[in-house]
Amino acid sequence: SSDLENLDLHTLNQPLIADVRARLQPQQKYIRGLFCGGTLCDETMFAVMEKHGDVYSNIQPDPEFRLKDINRSIKHTFLDFGDDDFTNGKPHPMIDPTNRISRLIEEARDPEVAVIVMDFVLGFGSHEDPVGSTIEAIKEAKAIAAAEGRELIILAYVLGTDLDTPSLEQ
């Protein structure tokens, strides 16, 4: 779609990481993860924990780093929006991304946030267009940061196959 053509899409590699780091402001030091999938949230959180000790989450096994208030991020924060904390009486974020989209905009306003990591899960039980439903919010989040002289990096992981609807290619 034309929305996707306007995005600066790249696969992750070391030169790209160095380039991104150079574009960040000194105060931009935190990663925020906004996940639909609990396993993807967990794996990403533990990967970040290998380099950083201050990683908070609503699914953090260490009580010291479990968020007391899921509506307020602390330092590096990884949220599983599919956890009961967020889905009690509400649809799962793979079906309805509204909660996660609101949080994306909120996190974009934090001048200490450098990167927002998100997953998009395709296939049965998922939103008919999970990426498309979030594109405008991603552009808005980047614009919020740009208006404050910051570049906000969105790192997205798409989980699916060409047999899923929508397909991985779409």
Show the residue positions of the predicted features.
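Conserved alpha/beta enzyme-core scaffold
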Residues: 4-11
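C-terminal non-catalytic interaction/assembly regions of soluble proteins
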Residues: 4, 22, 85-86, 90-170
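Short glycine-cluster motifs
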Residues: 27-28, 33-105, 110
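Structural motif
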Residues: 11-30, 40
